[in-house]
Regions:
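AMP-binding/adenylate-forming catalytic core of the ANL superfamily
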Residues: 1-76, 86, 91-95, 99-102, ...
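General small-molecule cofactor/ligand-binding pocket signal
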Residues: 81-84
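Short arginine-rich
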Residues: 102-108
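A cross-kingdom feature marking charged/low-complexity
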Residues: 123-136
Length: 136
């Protein structure tokens, strides 16, 4: 699992993902570290919700941020999460965290040959722009 460096602290994205996955409305999630001028990297959560969730996205995000703060600690600096329709994966089911990180950091990336559905990357990019994470 990935290790990100947040203000000199090494954090496991997997540990944050475990906490997010405990939320009753989250079907699956991914955490990536994106570049930050002040802290080096900051964690961003991508949340795919369970079908039929009635709770507002803002409430789910707020609860997820509080859960990470409580269980991982304030050192995680986890303050940003977005709700996405689905996560980009390989045909074998592995989440393409590296590709998503490159998109979020506005770096060039290659379309992975093993991607399950290439259209997902455009969806993720649109979500990142809409949530002001990716600034073009």
């Amino acid at each position: 699992d990935d290790i990100i460096n947040v203000a000199g602290h090494r954090l496991s994205t997997g540990a944050i993902e475990e906490v997010l996955a405990e939320h009753k409305s989250v079907a699956e999630c991914a955490v990536i570290g994106i570049a930050d001028k002040l802290k080096g990297q900051i964690p961003i959560g991508l949340l795919a919700l369970k079908a039929g969730v009635k709770q507002k996205n803002e409430e789910i995000i707020k609860e997820c941020i509080a859960m990470v703060r409580e269980k991982v600690g304030p050192v995680a600096a986890f303050k940003i999460a977005i709700v996405v329709k689905r996560l980009p994966k390989t045909r074998s089911g592995k989440v393409l965290r590296g590709t998503v990180r490159k998109i979020a950091d506005n770096e060039t990336y290659k379309m992975p040959a093993t991607i399950d559905d290439p259209a997902i990357l455009d969806e993720i990019k649109a979500d990142l722009i809409e949530n002001k994470i990716l600034k073009l």
